[in-house]
Structure formats: structure tokens, C-alpha cells
């Protein structure tokens, strides 16, 4: 990982700009490949790595051909500016991801993403995708920051992908919500953009205590979730 080009670039940039960066990269360990995120602190140091838990497999997202399900568990990284939980793409569709990170002390939820519209099915999943994460914010009283790529990508038939052919238009639409799920900042579908927002983490922590959502949880009643 120390030699990964994206991670090394992220470390230099984080140190230069004094920012925290979750950097996506492909991680190899012996014979296993993982879809991973390296969390880099504002001094350029590596805080830790999260390996994607949920691995999709359908006509457009063929990750099970390549990636092993992550073994790190959900991670929360204690950085210079706060505690951040990071899920990767398909992880964002599972409420368990957000709740586990919240229970581990996250103050902000990040979801680096690569998702798009499927021309063959004439399907635009963007509104559903966005509402799903707005729900995570509202249920955990925690801001969500989701970054999605843009552009078109063609997949040609080959042995490695089982002879499948498809194309995907990544629809961008990155966004930031407040702790109730309300959209504060949104990006376009086809342009590179930078979104910024300011949060008072102490104020947000006080709101979570006031609502009592975590106080009133009853984990012994949730056995079905782990079956």
C-alpha cells in the first residue's frame, strides 16, 4: 500500500493542504484483491484502511469477478478534524453500514462512489441513490458526504467478465446533507465540482443526545438482522 500511486499522491496532497482525505485504491494481499479506502490525516500520515464489505455482482457491476469481501469490519477514523466513517459505494445501500459506523463513534459519514445510469435498462437510479443516503443521515442524526464520479465507460466482452457487454454513464450528483438528511450542497451530473460545508461537531453530538435514538435502541430485539 505504501507504494500505491493514489495513496502516495493523497498523502502529499493532504499534507500540503492540511486536509483529511479518504482515498480509494485497489489493495492486494497475497492472492486476494480488495476494494479499499485509505484514510489520510491532515499531516499526510495514514490513519488506517477500510476494505469494502458489500461486493455487488450484476450485469453492470461485476466486482465479484475481482474482489474479496472486506475483512476489516466497518471503520471509524479519528482524524485531526473529527471522527469519520467511510463506506464504499455499494455499502451505502445497507443501513447497517451507517448504523455500525455511528455506533463506533463516527461524527460524519463519507461514501466515495462510482454509480451510474444503465442505458440498456433505461434506468436512472440517481434519485433513489440520493434518498437512500439522506435516510442514513436522518436515522443517525449525522451529516452524509457522498462523492460520485462522472463520465461514460464501455465494457467489452471478455473471458474475465463472463462475456458481458454493457455501458454505463456515471451520473455524478455528489452531495452533502445535514444531520436530518436535508440537502445542503449538490453537484451536477456531468461536471467536476468541489462542494464544501461547515459543521459544528459538538452541536451535532448534543442533538444526537437530545433525540435519544441511540439511548432507546434495543439490540436484543434485532437478532433477525444477523441471521
Residue ranges and their predicted role:
Residues 2-22, 83, 89-194:
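CN hydrolase (nitrilase-like) catalytic-core segments centered on the catalytic cysteine
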Residues 25, 39-41, 51-54, 78, ...:
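Short, structured patches in soluble enzyme cores that scaffold and shape functional sites
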Residues 33, 46, 183:
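Glycine-rich acetyl-CoA-binding "A-motif" of GNAT/NAT acetyltransferases
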Residues 41-42, 77-80, 178-179, 199:
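Active-site beta-strand termini and strand-to-loop segments that position acidic
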Residues 43, 49-50, 187:
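Short hydrophobic alpha-helix segments
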Residues 52-66, 191-209:
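A short, polar/charged loop-to-alpha-helix boundary motif
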Residues 72-104, 204-227:
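Cysteine/selenocysteine-centered motifs that mediate thiol-based redox chemistry or coordinate metal-sulfur cofactors
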Amino acid at each position: 500500500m505504501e507504494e500505491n500511486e493514489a495513496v502516495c499522491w493523497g498523502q502529499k496532497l493532504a499534507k500540503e493542504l492540511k486536509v483529511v482525505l479518504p482515498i480509494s485504491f485497489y489493495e492486494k494481499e497475497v492472492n486476494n484483491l480488495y476494494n479499499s479506502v485509505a484514510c489520510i490525516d491532515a499531516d499526510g500520515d495514514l490513519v488506517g484502511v477500510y476494505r469494502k464489505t458489500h461486493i455487488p455482482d450484476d450485469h453492470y457491476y461485476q466486482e465479484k469477478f475481482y474482489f474479496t469481501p472486506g475483512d476489516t469490519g466497518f471503520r471509524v477514523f479519528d482524524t485531526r478534524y473529527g471522527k469519520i466513517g467511510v463506506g464504499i459505494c455499494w455499502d451505502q445501500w445497507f443501513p447497517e453500514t451507517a448504523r455500525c459506523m455511528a455506533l463506533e463513534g463516527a461524527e460524519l459519514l463519507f461514501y466515495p462512489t462510482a454509480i451510474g445510469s444503465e442505458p440498456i435498462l433505461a434506468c436512472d437510479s440517481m434519485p433513489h441513490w440520493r434518498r437512500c443516503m439522506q435516510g442514513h443521515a436522518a436515522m443517525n442524526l449525522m451529516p452524509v458526504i457522498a462523492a460520485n464520479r462522472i463520465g461514460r465507460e464501455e465494457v467489452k466482452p471478455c473471458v474475465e467478465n463472463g462475456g458481458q457487454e454493457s455501458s454505463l454513464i456515471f451520473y455524478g450528483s455528489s452531495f452533502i446533507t445535514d444531520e436530518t438528511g436535508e440537502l445542503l450542497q449538490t453537484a451536477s451530473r456531468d461536471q467536476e465540482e468541489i462542494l464544501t460545508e461547515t459543521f459544528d461537531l459538538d452541536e451535532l453530538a448534543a442533538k444526537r443526545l437530545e433525540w435519544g435514538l441511540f439511548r432507546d435502541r434495543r439490540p436484543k430485539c434485532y437478532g433477525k438482522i444477523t441471521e
